[in-house]
């Protein structure tokens, strides 16, 4: 990573450690081999506190391998992809992940995409992968373990009144170049009440407390299908998020 991206990354990490009072816990050391990190979204895409929380946790793990972050195609549609590539971002595609593993890198995915990233306040403590199992199939094909990483609190950095899935479906946004299934109605600083803006553009998050848990590595069982493997990973992640949020006070933590 070059000097400028490294400095921006460090600023983001410092922000979540200080402003968001980030706490990181690690269940087991990450094995010294390429792994697939599977994370949940907080709110937003690239501009998501969970991205910086993961970066902070990665530093705490003391790993030297580069991380390739598979990122929604919308970043390149909006001509922002080239700005993200110095940070390790690549379009979310199977070939890009396999190439990264072949080169000895770790790979980071957020399987829920915009469904998980732009969910409403009342669903903020739910991990929405919508039954997707491609990430599990990828890990099985590459022969790498999955390391789940769960972050709680980022969904309280603003107020999302609705995910706007019905509006997005009515507008057929998933059929456009943007390929999105949500158009959230939210209240944030400085945008106030808006539809669809926050998540694509930066906003000033509330000082919500973040907690990140790096779970133990997971490998498929003999004869386990990709769907069953994905279900097992998702269930473990949701159970951890439930534990992190069971006594939580919004924003305060």
Regions found by a protein language model. Give the residues of each.
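Helix-to-loop junction immediately C-terminal to a conserved catalytic motif
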Residues: 11-41
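Catalytic core of membrane glycerolipid acyltransferases/transacylases, capturing the structured
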Residues: 32-97, 103, 113-130
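A broad, low-specificity signal marking well-ordered, structured residues that form hydrophobic/aromatic
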Residues: 22, 35, 67, 107, ...
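Pocket-edge structural micro-motifs
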Residues: 26, 39, 56, 71, ...
